[in-house]
Swiss-Prot record:
It comes from Arabidopsis thaliana (Mouse-ear cress). Binds preferentially to highly ordered alpha-glucans, such as starch and crystalline maltodextrins. Involved in the organization of the starch granule matrix, thus influencing starch turnover by modulating the accessibility of starch polymers to modifying and degrading enzymes involved in phosphorylation, hydrolyzes and synthesis, including starch synthases (SSI and SSIII), starch phosphorylases (PHS1), isoamylase, beta-amylase, glucan water dikinase (GWD) and phosphoglucan water dikinase (PWD). The gene is LESV. This is Protein LIKE EARLY STARVATION, chloroplastic. It is found in: Plastid, Chloroplast stroma. Keywords: Chloroplast, Plastid, Transit peptide. Residues 1-56 form a transit peptide. The lineage of its organism: Eukaryota, Viridiplantae, Streptophyta, Embryophyta, Tracheophyta. Belongs to the ESV1 family.
Length: 578
């Protein structure tokens, strides 16, 4: 046993030599101790032969393990001694510099006292606002992550795509039924979406840094070096959007009043799934707005005078202009222009930004962002962008917009929409509007403190489509929330087979609930299966002769979008600009 243990220790040390009776590997040692043990090879297990293993271990010479251990101990002692010396040196230096640090801090504090009280208060207010905004953003991010399944925009996953086998089953009975949430986070800082400096971290120059002498006096019509926009200055018709887009070109743009809040309306049941004139008018207005924004961006980028970098109007409004060119990580070159301004009394600060971007592989982009804030706590932001690109030889076009505003009292609203088209005929669109006010605000019957509206549609280009609408609201009633809503959706394949379904619901503050759901199964036979039920005991299930109607293709598709995007198609490639 001892002999076997000696062999194992020698093998672990790595200075071993094996002799199996056939081959012997030689190694020179100044002195060695031999351990011999009988070993049975694999062949001996079969009765063929046996062998002997010999282990030779050296403990002398220049590379013995005893010397290596001694060197390691010495090295460790030296390292500890060096660390003690270094600590002593730092301690001595710290004592010497303590007096210098105190004098330096005193000088810095004296410089702070030299700044006026008003300036210090202004900086502190900005810091408080920034920290509060960061805290709110973090809280919203947490809420969004917890409710990611409920607050997702557009179509949630590919399971909702139209297939050739859409039938009336319990599984698709819930298809398109969108979960309701209360808070939807807005798009935060513009740094991730727009080029150039960020508005929310900007502070206008103060005091002697800017004066009427330093600024170039300009006449009021040239206050902002842009041309009038005949589209945006048109009188709004009755069919226009209820939330007007801000425009720095309109006569009201620099009156610095917050756009009106979306009306708090009672949710009504959609009895018909055909597109209403309101929906068609809304989409038409969105297209006009997109075209007007594209014209404005192109006009600003082409007409601004590079020599004019700042100015002041007759009424004391001051503005600054900055331009730049950025290259994105994917090779896209972006050219942007930014105009910032502040009223004469310093109450309102705003920023308008425009940009165009392109590469040499077919990508083009136009965009604008308009932001503002005032001394009463009102803030607002309007973002718009359209782009076109090619993927596997197919042209894609995309349009998106995001309007958001919040008052100093905490009232908040947002409106977002997104559209995507490609040359194969596929298209997808969605929009989402919401608002919230202080829950202690008194309201008329049927109105709410929190209100949402979503709609979306998706076309596969072959005759299949999916559409949905979802409205819901919440009202604070003293010690709880009353909630109600209405939604419907439809899902059809190219063979006109599919399902239409909807639900109207209500939920009281004490958890009492009521709902009525309905559905229609279409199989292309000329008969429609209609069914439904309610929590109050209603129930129906019947088949009626009825033709199937649904939208196979969008009334505004890829070629309409392509023809209307004149300014976007005119954006030059980087190689054409040089």
């Amino acid at each position: 046993m001892a002999l076997r243990l000696g062999v194992s220790i020698g093998a672990a040390l790595g200075s071993s030599h094996w002799d199996d009776g056939q081959r012997v590997r030689q190694r020179d040692f100044s002195a060695s101790v031999n351990f011999t043990a009988p070993v049975t090879s694999r062949r001996s297990l079969r009765g063929s032969r046996t062998g002997v293993r010999i282990l030779r271990v050296s403990n002398e010479g220049r590379e013995s393990y005893l010397d290596m251990w001694k060197n390691a101990v010495d090295r460790e002692k030296k390292e500890k001694a060096f660390e003690k010396i270094a600590e002593n040196v730092v301690a001595v230096d710290g004592e010497k510099e303590k007096g210098g640090d105190l004098e330096k801090k005193s000088d810095e504090f004296q410089k702070i006292l030299e700044v006026s009280v008003e300036e210090r208060d202004r900086i502190q207010r900005m810091q408080v606002v920034d920290r509060a905004a960061a805290a709110i953003s973090a809280a919203r991010a947490i809420l969004a992550s917890n409710n990611s399944g409920d607050g997702k925009e557009g179509f949630p996953n590919e399971d909702n795509t139209v297939t050739s086998e859409v039938t009336e089953t319990p599984k698709n009975a819930k298809l398109g039924m969108w979960s309701r949430t209360v808070y939807v986070p807005r798009s935060e800082t513009s740094g991730t979406e727009t080029p150039g400096p960020d508005f929310w971290s900007w502070t206008p120059p103060q005091g002697s840094e800017i004066s009427s002498v330093d600024l170039q006096a300009v006449e009021k019509p040239a206050e902002f070096p842009t041309l009038p926009n005949p589209v945006l200055e048109k009188d709004k018709s009755a069919d226009s959007l209820s939330i007007p887009y801000e425009s720095m070109l309109s006569s009201e743009r620099h009156s610095f009043t917050i756009p009106p809040f979306e009306s708090l309306i009672e949710v009504r049941k959609e009895a018909e799934t055909k597109p209403s004139s309101e929906t068609l008018s809304t989409e038409h207005d969105l297209d006009l707005i997109s075209s007007a924004n594209a014209e404005e961006v192109a006009r600003v980028l082409d007409s601004l005078d590079e020599s004019s970098t700042h100015g002041v109007s007759e009424d004391g409004l001051k503005w600054w202009k900055q331009t730049g060119v950025e290259k994105r990580p994917d090779g896209v070159v972006c050219r942007w222009t930014m105009i910032r301004g502040v009223t004469a009394d310093g109450v309102v600060e705003w920023q308008d930004k425009y940009w165009e971007a392109s590469d040499d592989f077919g990508f083009k982009e136009l965009g604008s962002e308009k932001s503002g804030r005032d001394a009463t706590g009102n803030v607002w932001r309007e973002f718009w962008r359209e782009s076109m690109s090619q993927e596997n030889g197919v042209v894609h076009m995309e349009k998106t917009a995001d309007k958001w505003g919040k008052s100093g009292q905490g009232d908040e609203w947002q409106e977002k929409w997104w559209e995507h088209y490609d040359a194969t005929g596929k298209s997808e669109k969605w929009a989402h509007k919401w608002c919230s006010i202080d829950r202690n605000t008194p309201l008329d019957a049927g109105h709410a403190h929190v209100w949402h509206e979503r709609w979306g549609e998706k076309y596969d280009g072959q005759g299949g489509s999916t559409k949905y609408t979802d409205k819901w609201a919440e009202r604070w009633v003293g010690d709880g929330w009353d909630k109600w809503g209405d939604k419907w959706d439809e899902n059809f394949n190219p063979s006109a087979q599919g399902v239409k379904q909807g639900e109207t619901w209500w939920e009281g503050k004490h958890g009492d609930r009521w709902n009525r759901s309905w559905g229609e199964g279409h199989n292309g036979s000329g008969w429609v299966h209609k069914y439904g039920k309610s929590s109050s005991g209603e129930h129906w299930d019947t088949h009626v002769p009825q033709e199937t109607w649904y939208e196979k293709f969008p009334h505004f598709g890829f070629f309409h979008c392509f023809d209307n995007s004149v300014q976007l198609r005119a954006v030059k490639k980087p190689s054409d600009m040089s």
